[in-house]
UniProtKB/Swiss-Prot annotation:
SUPFAM superfamilies: Winged helix' DNA-binding domain (SSF46785). Belongs to the eukaryotic RPC34/RPC39 RNA polymerase subunit family. DNA-dependent RNA polymerase catalyzes the transcription of DNA into RNA using the four ribonucleoside triphosphates as substrates. Specific peripheric component of RNA polymerase III which synthesizes small RNAs, such as 5S rRNA and tRNAs. Its main location: nucleus. The lineage of its organism: Eukaryota, Metazoa, Ecdysozoa, Nematoda, Chromadorea. The keyword Transcription regulation does not apply. Keywords: DNA-directed RNA polymerase, Nucleus, Transcription. It comes from Caenorhabditis elegans. This is Probable DNA-directed RNA polymerase III subunit RPC6. The keyword Nucleus applies. Pfam families: RNA_pol_Rpc34. PANTHER family: RNA POLYMERASE III DNA DIRECTED , 39KD SUBUNIT-RELATED.
Length: 296
């Protein structure tokens, strides 16, 4: 009886010693380092303690860069499944919203291709994980089923089925430009004799435009302020709006139309003095004149 009790205490103490060392190693600890830090534990006792902690899910094995296996405290959510499913689920969970590629799963788990695909299929069937096709690539990455992927994977509001939605972008640019132009016109009408007031009243905060888009239900999906800022950047480059240092924007003044006479070829023709109707050099035979008239 005393011998059994001594063995139980010895097992509990050895597990406690191993656990304390692993807990102190934030990035995990490899077997060689653990052995050197537990010189008082016989090899069989140490291995028994490790196996017990792994079985109880208190510790987990993780493959570090270079293929070295490390022990670390298991902080992953426990799921009902095989050991392979636990390992794969843990790796996907650690990737959070960024997701993880199948190559990284293979390297991190040490599973062969057949084992990995079987495990992934099982986790997908249980609705514990899902696949995401990232923008700009045909490769799939894996992410927990309950997590929304990072915008860097999906492309955000302006992508539909991994394709840039140009029509949506152009619509939003037009809405932003029209709203800003309406505010500018209102500012001029309200302050006909005060140019400074016209200028100040024509500036608006991006939040006002975002609120307008939401209230008018221009989109069927929420538009974040970050998304709107991306649209406004395009509108600035297009010359539709201008932005000042405090972030407010206003519509650019309407572009004045240029008279076609400005580009009439006669103004720079070196033989204009010899050009006469009915002559060899004449407007009727001038190729430059024909091209200019065609562009009107």
């Amino acid at each position: 009886m005393a011998s059994i009790k001594e063995e139980l205490i010895s097992a509990a103490e050895s597990e406690s010693q191993v656990m304390q060392i692993v807990q102190a190693a934030l990035e995990g600890i490899d077997m060689d380092a653990l052995t050197s830090m537990t010189p008082g534990l016989p090899q069989t006792v140490r291995q028994t303690a490790i196996n017990s902690l792994l079985s109880s899910k208190k510790l987990a094995i993780q493959q570090a860069p270079g293929g070295v296996l490390r022990l670390k405290v298991n902080t992953s959510e426990q799921i009902a499944g095989t050991e392979e499913e636990q390992v794969i689920y843990s790796l996907i969970e650690e990737s959070k919203t960024r997701g993880i590629w199948i190559k990284e799963l293979r390297e991190g788990s040490g599973l062969n291709q057949l084992q990995l695909r079987k495990t992934l299929k099982s986790l997908e069937t249980k609705k514990l994980i899902k696949t995401i096709k990232a923008v700009g690539t045909t490769r799939k990455c894996y992410i927990l089923f309950s997590i929304e992927p990072d915008m860097s994977l999906t492309g955000g509001t302006f992508y539909s089925d991994q394709q840039l939605d140009s029509e949506l972008i152009n619509t939003l640019i037009s809405v932003c430009g029209s709203y800003a132009a309406s505010r500018r016109k209102h500012a001029i009408d309200e302050n006909p004799n005060n140019i400074q007031m016209q200028r100040e009243a024509s500036y608006i905060r991006p939040q006002e435009i975002a609120q307008f888009i939401t209230e008018k239900r221009v989109l069927n999906v929420p538009l974040s302020l970050e998304d709107l800022e991306r649209i406004l950047e395009v509108a600035v480059l297009d010359g539709t709006i201008e932005r000042r240092a405090d972030g407010k924007i206003r519509a650019c003044p309407p572009r004045s139309s240029i008279s076609p006479l400005v580009s009439v070829p006669c103004a720079i023709c070196p033989v204009v003095e010899d050009c006469r109707p009915g002559y060899v050099i004449s407007p009727q035979s001038c190729d430059y004149m024909k091209n200019w008239l065609a562009d009107l």
